[in-house]
Amino acid sequence: MKKKFKKETIAAKAGIASDQQYGAIVPPLYLTTNFIYDELGKDQLYEYTRQGNPTRDHLIAALSDLEGGIGGEILSSGMAAVSLVANILELKSKVILPHDCYGGTFRLFSSLAEKGMLEVHFINQAEESFLSQTISQINPDLIWLESPSNPLLQAVDIRKISEKAKTCSAIVAVDNTFMSPCFQNPLSLGADIVMHSTTKYINGHSDVIGGAVITSDEAILTKLKFWANNLGITGSPFDSYLTLRGLRTLGIRMEKHEKNAQAIVEILSNNAKVKSVFYPGLAHHPSHEIAKKQQSGFGGMLSFELKEGLTGVKKFIEKIELLPFAGSLGGFESLIGHPYTQSHGVHTPEKKEEIGISDGLVRISAGLENTDDLIDGIQSALN
């Protein structure tokens, strides 16, 4: 029986010493657009890079191994990954999404619903009635989960929802971007699909846009491969090469991201100017017990609300020096964000109020800097 290695080893060894031509330790970068046919009329593994490429295959093999899947596709962006999942559905399929889902996901599925292509329902999946009543009432074809959510870090019980989904033959897809394969594996909890914006933690260096979709189901895998090629949204070999290089240090990076996040949470929790702190590692966080049960870590993302609201946010952004104000997350550098105008800016003010995102909310992606430097920088900006 082949030995199953730990995640750090899987990431570090992905594709290593696989070059049979020259014996290179690091797998080569195949920048070619096409491949020579062996003979007329004979199918072969690689024909055209949109359809398949060895560099891209090394990356998806590593991610599939880390997530416990059988395969998947590397895409040109996180939203391309979301689009791919949407495209494997039949016309008029019913889809349930979180009421507080990422703005890009909300915009995509809302647009498809407006065109009459899908029937879409945005629902608070943390409510008890979601499991006991809503799923059965809607009888969905796809349930899309974001656990933990952006930016309030709300977790939902992936295992329970997956079990309920099976009663109506629904596919369960989980956006696992915030946790990475290091801290959560949705397929092992019963989900059918796991999706990542590899732009974030998996690449980890803020220099590549990418996405990934991994599955544990053969029929779904066939559809993913067909539609990724058909839509022309597969990732480039060079981006795959850089992402695989970033993936090799994922384990040790996630440890540091989490350590820094926990230190920041501690000082924010004791600051008089802070109204609330949102981090699943806090015992009083509403999703703490679920997160503790299905995650092996609490991650490097957190958010907090300032008592002064938007005025306080503006002051904080102006005064802080170490943390740039920018979109995205999961890179080596710590970043601050304003969900009200950035990730969830697509929503109306009323919708943002409904899902708990105020204009005084700040999101932090804890990077890899020295912990004391981060704390000093944040405290100075607040005080």
Task: Name each model-derived stretch.
Residues 44, 209, 243-248, 298-302, ...:
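Short amphipathic alpha-helical segments
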Residues 1-53, 59-62:
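N-terminal "arm"/small-domain region of PLP-dependent enzymes with the aminotransferase-like
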Residues 2, 13, 74-273, 278, ...:
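Conserved PLP-enzyme active-site core in the AAT-like
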Residues 110, 121, 132, 141, ...:
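PLP-dependent enzyme catalytic core of the Aspartate aminotransferase-like
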